[in-house]
UniProtKB/Swiss-Prot annotation:
It is an enzyme of class 1 (oxidoreductase). It comes from the Eukaryota. NCBIfam families: nadp_idh_euk, PRK08299.1. This is Isocitrate dehydrogenase [NADP], mitochondrial. Its cofactor is Mg(2+); Mn(2+). Homodimer. Induction: By growth with glucose as a carbon source.
Length: 428
């Protein structure tokens, strides 16, 4: 057995072992409901027995956020900025019903939005591909990663109802009249009632989006496609196209060529058609609305939101946050509270840990940690692919709804733990 094998083969069931030392802290963001239950089990079964790691813990449960007036979320984001890597459990974004359920002081904002606003960066969603699990788009053999520019556009737009006939104008007033001219743009002459909307974006945000996208393409060694409708929105979408091209030519072209990958702009309608026809294996950089829609299409096309990871990457590539792309699995949590059996898919939550640890290992130049993260992913996938052990959602995706076809939440994690020990032991 190699030195790496001896270092990796550590479990609470063994009398003697040497854990892998994680050089720098990792920020752990705990969450809500069923995912919180799973999160704790993953940490105790699959992480802490193998790693000597300083976890900077932040409880982002909705009760904790309410008790701290959401300061805990801001503190967690600042900690990620300080240490470089955060690993996040799924959290509740309260609506009116949740405010009443938890007796909250107010309807707190999405923790993900708060963290993203503090860190900046781009959210990328990547499917976890298991050949055994049927895909609604059978041709998709390799992951399709969706990068969503979650800033501005329709999501920060000002919209209004037009009550009747009149003229609509768009007015720009420069803060410093010596640097730019005021502009008044005629939008439409209404003959009757209607609707109107004005939206925006910034060069700074688009440029950051470009850097995050190019860096991920280099890291993953995948082709990158920016998709817009610049033939219609010649200035608005054209600005995205121009900034991406400028950033690519100035800073990334030579590296792309060295790796044998390429960058290309394509019209969104053409790209979506090509995506369906393709075998996968590329990154799509999309504007806010397009990214919102396409990420869910890709998730369903690959089989399940339970097999989708989400990472936040900053433009400088030095700050990274990983989490599962799904929610807190409330329905299963209600069953858990009643003491009933649950069969909750923990794969995306396991991958939140593995992707964060992999990034920590890369930043700290710790090959053993990177190796462990990869083995953890392999063990998780092989539990399903080779051992045929899966949770109910995956069994149903395979067309089998018999009780014997799936295991409980706890049994699946036990199976992954067993497979992890087996794969570590097999390292020569």
């Amino acid at each position: 057995m190699s030195m790496l094998s001896r270092r990796l083969f550590s479990t609470s069931r063994l009398a003697a072992f040497s854990k892998i030392k994680v050089k720098q802290p990792v920020v752990e963001l705990d969450g809500d409901e069923m995912t919180r239950i799973i999160w704790d089990k993953i940490k105790k079964k699959l992480i802490l027995p193998y790693l000597d790691v300083d976890l900077k813990y932040y409880d982002l449960s909705v009760e904790s956020r309410d008790a701290t007036s959401d300061k805990i979320t801001q503190d967690a984001a600042e900690a990620i900025k300080k240490y470089g890597v955060g690993i996040k459990c799924a959290t509740i974004t309260p609506d009116e019903a949740r405010v009443k359920e938890f007796n909250l002081h107010k309807m707190w904002k999405s923790p993900n939005g708060t963290i993203r606003n503090i860190l900046g960066g781009t959210v990328f969603r990547e499917p976890i591909v298991i050949p055994r699990i049927p895909r609604l788009v059978p041709r998709w053999e390799k992951p399709i990663i969706i990068g969503r520019h979650a800033h501005g556009d329709q999501y920060k737009a000002t919209d209004t109802l037009i009550p009747g006939p009149g003229s609509l104008e768009l007015v720009y007033k420069p803060s410093d009249p010596t640097t730019a001219q005021p502009q008044t743009l005629k939008v439409y002459d209404y003959k009757g009632s209607g609707v109107a909307m004005a939206m925006y974006n910034t060069d700074e945000s688009i440029e950051g989006f470009a850097h995050s996208s190019f860096k991920l393409a280099i890291d993953k060694k995948l082709n990158l496609f920016l998709s817009t409708k610049n033939t219609i929105l010649k200035k608005y979408d054209g600005r995205f196209k121009d900034i991406f091209q400028e950033v690519y030519e100035a800073q990334y072209k030579s590296k792309f060529e060295q790796l044998g990958i390429h960058y290309e702009h394509r019209l969104i309608d053409d790209m979506v058609a090509q995506m369906i026809k393709s075998k996968g294996g590329f990154i799509m950089a999309l504007k806010n609305y397009d990214g919102d829609v396409q990420s869910d299409i890709v998730a369903q096309g690959f089989g399940s939101l339970g097999l989708m990871t989400s990472i936040l990457v900053t433009p400088d590539g030095k700050t990274f946050e990983s989490e599962a792309a799904h929610g807190t699995v409330t329905r299963h949590y209600r069953k858990y509270q009643k003491g009933e059996e649950t069969s909750t898919n923990s794969i995306a939550s396991i991958f939140a840990w593995s992707r964060g640890l992999l990034k920590r290992g890369e930043l700290d130049n710790t090959p053993a940690l990177c190796k462990f993260a990869n083995i953890l992913e392999s063990a998780t996938l092989n539990t399903v692919q080779q051992d045929g052990i899966m949770t109910k959602d995956l069994a149903l995706a395979c067309g089998n709804n018999e009780r014997s076809a799936y295991v409980t939440t706890e049994e699946f994690l036990d199976a992954v733990e067993k497979r992890l020990q087996k794969e570590i032991k097999s390292i020569e």
